[in-house]
Regions:
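Short amphipathic alpha-helical patches
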Residues: 92-93, 98, 179-187, 365
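Assembly/oligomerization interface modules of large self-assembling protein complexes
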Residues: 52-136, 156-157, 189, 193
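Sequence/fold signature of self-assembling virion shell proteins
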Residues: 2-48, 54-67, 191-217, 223-226, ...
Length: 366
């Protein structure tokens, strides 16, 4: 960490450090530092736009006191909980080796012993596809924030966070890969790759439970419209109990959206009355601080569909990236009044063992 730089206790991200006793940095210096922060390369080996090797910008006049911090956004912490693995081939097979059935048996009669298969191999094909994560910073923004010593670190943290959030967006909503992609038609980046949920739909239909309904309730919790299940808990519990074999049930979680948890929890929270403080405390501690879904720990994540729940262990989900495929080009583009960073990765979303999870899909809330 640079001298004088501080870290936020809540976000762990770099916090702004004001320059003191010196004139704000020249634009060219800021561009150099931003490029180095975003690309990890010294600006001397970056290919800038033609004629922009030495850009003469006047120093920015002193501005009113400003402070910068990383804007509030969704968390991409989910990526730290799953496998993010480098691979050497752009496509191939991922093989999971597991144990077969029981091996123990008794044969004391001198008959031929018949060994059982002690290991099973489950291959799944993967293909890493290129996805672009291009971004730019306008010259106006660079002008406005040259007086912040750690503006490059803040910019890098924001870009890194957005890139990881886009990976979640594709992982939970991606249905196909199309070049070029169409952000207007597919705002949730459905055409930027096949995500984890779609992998279940395409490759493990027997592990997809689809089209079931949950009863509708009024604010008092009374059923006003009957469904296949009285609660979302009952649907999820019955789903994973029937679809996932016992040997895969040890560390399951229910991945869902925040709206799904809200639908479950609101009737209980709404029923709490002021003259029942113990009940209010119980609801807060058990339900809100330690949410569950279908008797499993609930893991709400950004961009997850409101009509689905993925039950799996987190180590069953992977994001593969192709070694040596990351390409980054930083260009100062004065003709567009911006500093652009062009970046691409080759990635693939993988479910290691379909039998170790299930997708409850197309849930209908009555």
């Amino acid at each position: 960490m640079a001298e004088g730089e501080t870290m936020s206790k809540t976000t762990g991200m770099p916090q702004p450090v004001m320059l003191t006793g010196e004139k704000p940095r020249a634009m060219a210096t800021v561009i150099t530092r931003v490029v180095e922060a975003l690309t990890g390369e010294k600006s001397g080996i970056i290919n800038f736009a033609s004629g922009a090797v030495s850009v003469n910008y006047s120093d920015v006049s002193p501005s009113p006191v400003q402070a910068g911090a990383l804007a509030a956004n969704y968390s991409a912490e989910f990526l730290n909980r799953i496998n993010v693995l480098p691979v050497k081939a752009i496509e191939g097979e991922s093989v999971m080796v597991g144990s077969g059935g029981p091996l123990a048996y008794v044969n004391n009669r001198g008959e031929r012993r018949n060994p059982q298969a002690g290991a099973t191999m489950t291959p799944h094909r993967y293909q890493c596809r290129k996805v672009n994560f291009d971004t730019f910073i306008s010259h106006d923004d660079l002008d406005a924030w040259t007086h912040l010593e750690n503006y490059p670190e803040l910019a890098k943290a924001a870009v890194d966070q957005r890139r990881n959030l886009d990976r979640l967006l594709i992982g939970f909503n991606g249905t196909h890969y199309s070049s070029p992609s169409d952000p207007e038609t597919y705002p949730e980046r459905q055409d930027c790759g096949v995500g984890w949920l779609e992998k279940y739909r395409q490759e493990a239909r027997k592990k997809v439970i689809s089209g079931l309904s949950v009863a509708g309730r009024d604010e008092g919790g009374k059923i006003v419209s009957y469904g296949d299940y009285g609660t979302i808990d009952a649907l999820v519990l019955d789903g994973w109990q029937s679809a996932i074999a016992p040997q895969y049930r040890m560390d399951l979680v229910a991945v869902c959206s925040l709206n799904t948890l809200y639908r479950k929890e609101y009737p209980y929270v709404n029923a709490v009355v002021p003259n029942q403080p113990n009940m209010e405390l119980l609801v807060n501690q058990i339900m809100l601080n330690n949410p569950t879904l279908g008797n499993l720990p609930a893991m709400p994540v950004p961009f997850f569909p409101d009509n689905a729940v993925l039950v799996t262990s987190l180590r069953n989900l992977s994001l593969y990236w192709l070694e040596g495929s990351t390409r980054t080009l930083a260009k100062d583009e004065p003709e567009y009044n911006r500093l652009s960073v062009y970046e691409s990765w080759n990635e693939a979303y993988m479910v290691e063992r379909y039998e170790a999870g299930c997708l409850i899909d197309a849930i209908f809330w009555r």
